[in-house]
Swiss-Prot record:
This is Glutamate--tRNA ligase. Binds 1 zinc ion per subunit. It is an enzyme of class 6 (ligase). One of its GO terms (biological process) is glutamyl-tRNA aminoacylation. Its cofactor is Zn(2+). It comes from the Bacteria. Its main location: cytoplasm. Catalyzes the attachment of glutamate to tRNA(Glu) in a two-step reaction: glutamate is first activated by ATP to form Glu-AMP and then transferred to the acceptor end of tRNA(Glu). Keywords: Aminoacyl-tRNA synthetase, ATP-binding, Cytoplasm, Ligase, Metal-binding, Nucleotide-binding, Protein biosynthesis, Zinc. It catalyses: tRNA(Glu) + L-glutamate + ATP = L-glutamyl-tRNA(Glu) + AMP + diphosphate. Its EC number is 6.1.1.17. GO terms for cellular component: cytosol.
């Protein structure tokens, strides 16, 4: 049997991390079994579904490189198929037309609740033989079995049973002729030959209804697996108050897709005590029986740690392709300065996100208007004038411009003036970067370049001279 899974989001908003984890688990299960992964857009909620949300879902899936083998399919383009199946069910007696008014249904609901009963349709039209005009408004209901129970072996939670007496005859077609969500899902899974449905635990109550419809259609019933929810670190359901929840917001905040995928796969699944997984390892090791039944807590600090790891572990050239977007957001012109791959090597240890990297690299490419006030006050003092002049001249005299030779020039300056490296290094750092912190000074000066470094040292010397004149 060919394994076939699906990810079926509703395009009413962005792709959130819970949906992304579900998509990842479905994708991994299919890839682990050499199967196929289908993308289906469940856009039957015409009022809330938007083209922007569809685009956001696609963007998130593409950014995470969760490529699909079929689709995207759109439910709104399959209404003829759904209605044909409903008409067939009406003929076979597994569905019936319901003419009950909203007023009657509301009164029935209030009466049942007053008795402490679970609100459910009482089946009045199921057994009615009244004649109705063809154009009289009605819904179509599924004739749910009235006896027995539905049992399915959830691949994460084990056997789950629902009594058919708990399930009422759900509406499968509205008065406007549009099919309902639970019915469309069933026909889609049947037509698309889905073998395994991996989805959130909020769908557990839909499962027995969908199984009963599948059986009425004499269609194969897929295997179900319901993934637990994701909570914030406070134990409450993950929401915007916990920070970013949109996949693309994590991109915007400077995370690598590898970091988010690695974090999401471990958010409810484990393979021994391994923390770092390549995509190939995820595919190789992923199984549903290793997915936890318990809710997972989202920990941003752990995700940040993973992101820092991947910034430094992945090839700098690859990281640079993602950094480029953030550089563009900061409007930094990188034509005059180090290659972005070299920048990743320079700043990787210091920066936990690509956004932080982009925001802290401007001095490599553009001259700054002024020095950081605190750093200048501390290090660009008259006592720094001679070390800066000497190191400037030694940098200018370097014939082979390498980081190693820059280091020798700084060391030679300290030796010549008989001062510690800090007496040369700190004023030089403030002079060439404008601030008191940077990567190792030799590689920083080397990356900034000889001409620009000397110009900035001269600017710092002018700043010191002006400061002397003001005293």
């Amino acid at each position: 049997m060919k394994i076939k899974t699906r990810f079926a989001p509703s395009p009413t908003g962005y792709l959130h991390v819970g949906g992304a984890r579900t998509a990842l688990y479905s994708w991994l299960f299919a890839r682990n079994h050499g199967g196929e992964f289908v993308l289906r857009i469940e856009d039957t909620d015409l009022e809330r579904s938007t083209p922007e949300a569809i685009e956001a879902i696609m963007d998130g899936m593409n950014w995470l490189s969760l490529e699909w083998d079929e689709g995207p399919y759109y439910q709104t383009k399959r209404f003829d198929r759904y209605n044909a199946v409903i008409d067939q069910m009406l003929e076979e007696g597994t569905a019936y037309k319901c003419y009950c008014s909203k007023e009657r249904l509301e009164a029935l609901r209030e009466e049942q609740m007053a008795k402490g009963e679970k609100p459910r349709y009482d089946g009045r039209c199921r057994h009615s033989h009244e004649h109705h005009a063809d154009d009289e408004p009605c819904v179509v209901r599924f004739a749910n079995p009235q006896e027995g129970s539905v049992v399915f072996d959830d691949q994460i939670r084990g056997p789950i049973e629902f009594s058919n007496q708990e399930l009422d005859d759900l509406i499968i077609r509205r008065t406007d002729g549009s099919p309902t969500y639970n019915f469309c899902v069933v026909v889609d899974d049947w037509d698309m030959e889905i073998t395994h449905v991996i989805r959130g635990e909020d769908h557990i109550n839909n499962t027995p209804r969908q199984i009963n419809i599948l059986k009425a259609l004499k269609a194969p019933v897929p295997v179900y697996a319901h993934v637990s929810m994701i909570n914030g670190d406070d134990g409450k359901k993950l929401s915007k108050r916990h920070g970013a929840v949109s996949v693309m917001q994590y991109r915007d905040d400077g995370y690598l897709p590898e970091a988010l995928l690695n974090y999401l796969v471990r958010l409810g699944w484990s393979h021994g005590d391994q923390e770092i997984f390549t995509r190939e390892e995820m595919i190789k090791y992923f199984t549903l029986n290793a997915v936890s039944k318990s809710a997972s807590a989202f920990n941003t600090d752990k995700l940040l740690w993973l992101n820092h790891h991947y910034i430094n572990a992945l090839p700098p050239e690859y990281v640079a392709t993602h950094l480029q977007w953030h550089i563009e957001q900061e409007n930094i012109d990188t034509r005059n300065g180090p290659q972005l791959a070299d920048l990743v090597k320079l700043l990787g240890e210091r920066c936990k996100t690509l956004k932080e990297m982009a925001q802290s690299c401007r001095y490599f490419y553009e001259d700054f208007a002024e020095f950081d006030a605190d750093a200048a006050k501390k290090h660009l003092r008259p006592v720094a004038r001679q070390p800066l002049e000497v190191v400037r001249d030694k940098l200018a005299a370097i014939t082979d411009w390498t980081a190693e030779n820059v280091h020798h020039a700084i060391q030679a300056t300290a030796d010549e003036l008989e001062v510690g490296m800090g007496k040369v290094g700190m004023p030089l750092r403030v002079a060439v970067t404008g601030a008191g912190q940077s990567p190792a000074l030799d590689v920083t000066v080397h990356a900034i370049g000889r001409t620009r470094s000397i110009e900035r040292i001269n600017k710092a010397l002018a700043f010191i001279a002006e400061r002397e004149n003001q005293q």
